[in-house]
Structures are given as C-alpha cells and as structure tokens.
C-alpha cells in the first residue's frame, strides 16, 4: 500500500465507500462524483500506479482485473457499459493507482475528444 494513496486507503477500508465487489485482490466501489447513472471504479488492492507500470510478473493479474471488470459491467449495466482507463496527467488520471471506470445506466454518446 502506498501511504498517501486514496485508493489504497479505500481498498483497506480506512476510507468508507459503497462497495460493489471485493475479493482478496480486487475492489470495486461506486464513484463519489459519478458522471453517469452507474459509475463504478475497479481497482487492484495491490498498488500499481498505471498501465504503464505493468510488468511480465503482473500481466496475468491485470487480465484477472479486466475479467472482473467485465463481470461487474455485465451485472450492473446489462444494457451496455463503457470502460475507461486514464494513463497519465494529460489523459486525466488524477489518482496514481490503476483503476477502471465502468460507466452505464444510460445511452452514452461518443463525442470528439
């Protein structure tokens, strides 16, 4: 755990959240500032700053995280959902702990970036 990482603290239940899913390695919770009717964050409990820090040693683990993203997405958003992962400040990553946004609950537009 990174001492100052808010997502590590949420996964360790030092900061309260609305839990959607949890196992020994993965934690999913509702975003406190949702941008869609359903907005869930899925994180590994292990601190990994971003996809750019994935190594051969943890590539299979990230596959497991993405599998859980798909299971949670199908359950929570049966009509469809979007998965977003921001990498780096220019992309909008504000928390340096890898996380996947599941967005759904309405028809989502695809606008210009």
Curated annotation (Swiss-Prot):
It comes from the Eukaryota. PROSITE patterns: HIT_1, HIT_2. It catalyses: adenosine 5'-phosphoramidate + H2O = AMP + NH4(+). GO terms for molecular function: adenosine 5'-monophosphoramidase activity; hydrolase activity; nucleotide binding. Residues 6-113 form the HIT domain. Gene3D superfamilies: HIT-like. InterPro entries: Histidine_triad_CS (IPR019808), Histidine_triad_HIT (IPR001310), HIT-like (IPR011146), HIT-like_sf (IPR036265). A motif (Histidine triad motif) lies at residues 97-101. The keyword rRNA processing does not apply. Its EC number is 3.9.1.-. Keywords: Cytoplasm, Hydrolase, Nucleotide-binding, Nucleus. It is found in: Nucleus; Cytoplasm. AMP binds at residues 31, 86, 92, 94, 99, 101. The keyword Cytoplasm applies. It holds the Pfam family HIT. PANTHER family: HISTIDINE TRIAD HIT PROTEIN. Hydrolyzes purine nucleotide phosphoramidates with a single phosphate group, including adenosine 5'monophosphoramidate (AMP-NH2), adenosine 5'monophosphomorpholidate (AMP-morpholidate) and guanosine 5'monophosphomorpholidate (GMP-morpholidate). Hydrolyzes lysyl-AMP (AMP-N-epsilon-(N-alpha-acetyl lysine methyl ester)) generated by lysine tRNA ligase, as well as Met-AMP, His-AMP and Asp-AMP, lysyl-GMP (GMP-N-epsilon-(N-alpha-acetyl lysine methyl ester)) and AMP-N-alanine methyl ester. May also function as scaffolding protein that mediates protein-protein interactions. This is Histidine triad nucleotide-binding protein. It comes from Entamoeba histolytica (strain ATCC 30459 / HM-1:IMSS / ABRM).
